[in-house]
Amino acid sequence: MFDLLSEEMVYHIFCFLDLSSFIKCSRVCRKWRRISDDEKLWNLYGEFFGTNKPIDQYIGWRKMIKHVTDSSDNYLYKELTGSIKTYGIVVTNSSVKQSLISKSSIPIQYSYHRTTKFTLKYYRPNKTINQIDNDYRMFYIVDIPEYYTNKQKKCMIQKYTSVSRDYDWINIFVFICSNTDVPYVTSITNEISARIRVITIDEINDAFDWIGKMIWRQDLMYHSCFCPREIPLTQQELYAMTNFNFPKTKLLKTKYSSTNDCLSLCMVQ
């Protein structure tokens, strides 16, 4: 029955499934499993930060979530929906920008399913990483002086992002620059494997909202190398994603339901 569908048709349908349905349909038969190994397909469903195959990174993420939810009454769900404090470093020479950044960080920001309160520590650009007294916080906001040469700007970006190589929990960076510098700074940051946003100072409020979302996604990864692209829109959906106490019969029915849905889509196409 499944062999009657061409590989092109199955691939096309896989592109329209959600992550859960995609996983279940990948188990239908060997042919579908082989098609589902395509990395381009997986990039539609998640972000991958490791070197293993996407399916292996996904399985590792599910195992970690299962462990934490089974052992502590869905601890992860409570963490993802509760209020948190998060700490960051701001590097700037400008007292005016420091004031703007400080004011933007005071309100408690609502990001996805929880509120985040930011606590910042300020440093001057002439401080090296070592001179920051090993104060390795979760994220960096770096103000790039407009009078710097392109070489100095590139060195500054590389200096601060290099900390993520030794401290893998630090991979969220916001670089503030002038409108004219945005294209150049963006071209440099595009070569760096981290969560990076390039902004002007006028966009600092949006930047804090973005930081809150990135930290939320990082918590959802729970020390794994995978993060789903499709984030639950409601707390009910989030609970379903992080809860593993469903009866096996329900899971079995869901599997066949997803398979039938996929076949129905194929017939429509």
From Swiss-Prot:
Q: What is the organism field in this record?
A: Acanthamoeba polyphaga mimivirus (APMV)
Q: Which SUPFAM superfamilies match?
A: F-box domain
- In this chain the F-box domain maps to 1-45
- Pfam families associated with the record: F-box-like (PF12937)
The record's section on SMART domains has:
FBOX (SM00256)
Q: What InterPro entries does the record point to?
A: F-box-like_dom_sf (IPR036047), F-box_dom (IPR001810)
User: Which PROSITE patterns does the record cross-reference, listed alphabetically?
Assistant: FBOX (PS50181)
Kindly provide the name given to this protein in its UniProt entry: Putative F-box protein L127
